[in-house]
Amino acid sequence: MTFGHCRRASTLRSAFVLGLCGLLLAGCSGADDDRDAAALKDKYVTVNLGVRGPVDLPADGVGNLQTFSPQQIYAGKKLFESNCQNCHVGGTTTPNPKVSLALAKLQGATPPRDNIQSLVQYMRLPMSYDGSEETFNCRKSDWIEDDEAQNLAAFILRASQKARGWGTARLEANQDSMTTAPP
């Protein structure tokens, strides 16, 4: 085998590897495009929550904000539907205590649960509404990754701010179902 032949084979191998990497990257970006499209087609997210672009939500109790994309809010909605909706349909709470996820109720908790940090903390270690004792937790503290917990908290906060009837008995006033699939 001559030196030129080895060099050509090496160049072909490099081109193949680069081409394969390009295909993989293109495939990955396609998945993101699908998530982007799903988030922007979801009526509950775009209409009821008013999310058509990035939204700022309270990050902590001192006024810092955290920006969430429509895709993150949509991911939080999907997590809510698959993990929380049985007990918290439409932001209500069906088992005891019957304290809903309405914004006023989140703000009235001790400590307030009206920001991303406090909701994630509550998901990890639930406390009674008055903050005096640990409450029943249906999941282990590590049941969800931090970024997923933040997306879930973002969905809950945005719904408590914008969704008509969220956390109230007037859920029938909501025009679009929580579980309506995107068209």
Curated annotation (Swiss-Prot):
Heme c binds at C84, C87, H88, C138. Gene3D superfamilies: Cytochrome c-like domain (1.10.760.10). It is found in: Cell inner membrane. It holds the Pfam family Cytochrom_C550. GO terms for molecular function: electron transfer activity; heme binding; iron ion binding. Its main location: membrane. It is a peripheral membrane protein. Binds 1 heme c group covalently per subunit. Residues 1-31 form the signal peptide. One of its GO terms (biological process) is photosynthesis. Its cofactor is heme c. It comes from the Bacteria. InterPro entries: Cyt_c-like_dom, Cyt_c-like_dom_sf, Cytochrom_C550, PsbV_cyt_c550-like. Keywords: Cell inner membrane, Cell membrane, Electron transport, Heme, Iron, Membrane, Metal-binding, Photosynthesis, Photosystem II, Signal, Transport. The keyword Membrane applies. GO terms for cellular component: photosystem II; plasma membrane. Belongs to the cytochrome c family. PsbV subfamily. PSII is composed of 1 copy each of membrane proteins PsbA, PsbB, PsbC, PsbD, PsbE, PsbF, PsbH, PsbI, PsbJ, PsbK, PsbL, PsbM, PsbT, PsbX, Psb30/Ycf12, peripheral proteins PsbO, CyanoQ (PsbQ), PsbU, PsbV and a large number of cofactors. It forms dimeric complexes. Probably one of the extrinsic, lumenal subunits of photosystem II (PSII). PSII is a light-driven water plastoquinone oxidoreductase, using light energy to abstract electrons from H(2)O, generating a proton gradient subsequently used for ATP formation. The extrinsic proteins stabilize the structure of photosystem II oxygen-evolving complex (OEC), the ion environment of oxygen evolution and protect the OEC against heat-induced inactivation. Low-potential cytochrome c that plays a role in the OEC of PSII. This is Photosystem II extrinsic protein V. It comes from Gloeobacter violaceus (strain ATCC 29082 / PCC 7421).
